[in-house]
From Swiss-Prot:
InterPro entries the record matches: Com_YlbF, YheA/YmcA-like_dom_sf
Membrane-spanning intervals of the chain: none
Identification of the protein by name: UPF0342 protein Athe_0692
Alphabetized Pfam families for the sequence: Com_YlbF
Species assigned in the record: Caldicellulosiruptor bescii (strain ATCC BAA-1888 / DSM 6725 / KCTC 15123 / Z-1320)
Family statement: Belongs to the UPF0342 family.
Lineage: Bacteria, Bacillati, Bacillota, Bacillota incertae sedis, Caldicellulosiruptorales
Amino acid sequence: MRNVYDIAYELATALKESNEFKRFKAAKEKIEKDEKLKQMISDFKKKQFELEQKRLKGEEVTSSDVYSLQQLYQIISLNPDIEEYLSAEMMLAKIIADISKIIADSIEFKDELWGFADK
């Protein structure tokens, strides 16, 4: 039987060779060259993180909080480089989440912390 870590490295290599990863990497490299774009994305992600932390702490997330984040997203995504980066990042994150779910489901590891529990 093959070592699970070796298989994990093979999966990582396959992911690096995927079109989705290549798209993300190219978009990220473009953003990395522009400090203004990097700062815009950083500010957006910081606000997104703060909102998620509020939710996880059981604090009220108001419609105003959500609207403010949506407005910020709409503004920054008017820039085609930022829109491409965020879109590519979301697609890559979805693939990674799908892979995690496939693994968790196949070994019947359904833990609420991972969000895979049957409801």
